[in-house]
Regions:
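Acidic, low-complexity terminal tails and accessory targeting/binding regions
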Residues: 1-2, 85-112, 141, 156-162, ...
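Loop-to-helix element that buttresses phosphate recognition and phosphoryl-transfer chemistry
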Residues: 3-5, 10-61, 139-144, 148
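Conserved beta-strand termini and adjacent loop/short-helix elements that scaffold enzyme active sites
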Residues: 7, 79-81, 214
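Active-site metal-binding loops of divalent metal-dependent hydrolases
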Residues: 10, 169, 215-217
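Phosphate-coordination/substrate-recognition cap region in phosphate-metabolizing enzymes
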Residues: 35-119
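Short glycine/proline- and acidic residue-enriched helix-loop micro-motifs
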Residues: 103-142
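A mid-sequence, solvent-exposed acidic-amphipathic segment
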Residues: 134-163
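A short beta-strand-loop-alpha-helix capping motif that often carries His-Thr
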Residues: 164-175
């Protein structure tokens, strides 16, 4: 039964200036994931990745591990539909729409404090989905349509064989929304709880895609690895 492995990128930089590149920990997470996949001889007939640097660097860490193990991994094909929503652009639009929102004010007081990011993202995504954040290049409906295109492309590729795709939490959570018919509120909650380099696995059946596992971290499951698990 053909399987799709969806992977979130590793931890990104700690500031808005370098969030599009992996942190040192993010590189470690990516390498560990690649080592686990290689050790379990996971083979893929196609590999896809979004165009964001943090996504491409994550795939590079996986590919390096395969190379060290002497295993073949198809070259990653860029699939723009796997790009994350533009967080900085969304926050800027949210600030224009709701300049006195408490989550925004807390973040503005300490913009590089990762602890403020989840609550700000939650409020921003709810406003975006509700249509009250409009000064953005991609509205929520367009984002949802893009995820649907990604799902169709990956499902088509699964007809040939197993697929690996590296993306981001927003894309992966909304992909799940499409498969399971989740509410927007539930999808946003899932988005915020998705771990860096977390794995989600789908199987292609006659009835379509079926979820097999969600947000798994088999490569970071040892007790001594707890400090390697991150959400932001």
């Amino acid at each position: 039964m053909p399987q799709l492995l969806l992977v979130r990128h590793g931890q990104a930089g700690a500031t808005t200036a370098n969030y599009n590149e992996l942190s040192p920990l993010g590189h470690t997470q990516s390498a560990r994931l690649g080592e686990w996949l290689a050790a379990h001889r996971r083979e893929f007939t196609a590999v896809y990745v979004g165009g964001l640097r943090r996504q491409r660097e994550t795939l590079a860490g996986i590919a390096d591990a395969y190379a060290r193990a002497g295993l073949a991994l198809p070259s990653g094909e860029e699939l723009p539909e796997l790009d994350e929503f533009r967080f900085v652009e969304l926050v800027r639009a949210f600030a224009n729409a709701q300049p006195d929102h408490p989550d925004l004010l807390r973040w503005q007081a300490a913009p590089d404090d990762r602890g403020h990011w989840p609550t700000l993202l939650r409020s921003t995504l709810h406003a975006w989905a509700a249509g009250t954040v409009t000064e953005v290049g991609e509205d929520y409906a367009a984002f949802r349509a893009r995820i649907a295109r990604a799902r169709e492309r990956l499902q088509w590729q699964l007809e040939i064989g197993p697929v690996l795709a590296v993306s981001s939490a927003g894309v992966i959570s909304h992909f799940l929304q499409d498969v399971l018919g989740l509410s927007t509120d539930a999808t946003i909650d899932i988005n915020l709880g998705y771990a860096n380099t977390g794995l989600s696995e789908y199987r292609l059946t006659r009835a379509g895609l079926k979820l097999a596992q969600w947000n798994a971290l088999p490569h970071l499951s040892a007790p001594q690895d707890r400090e390697l698990v991150t959400l932001v």
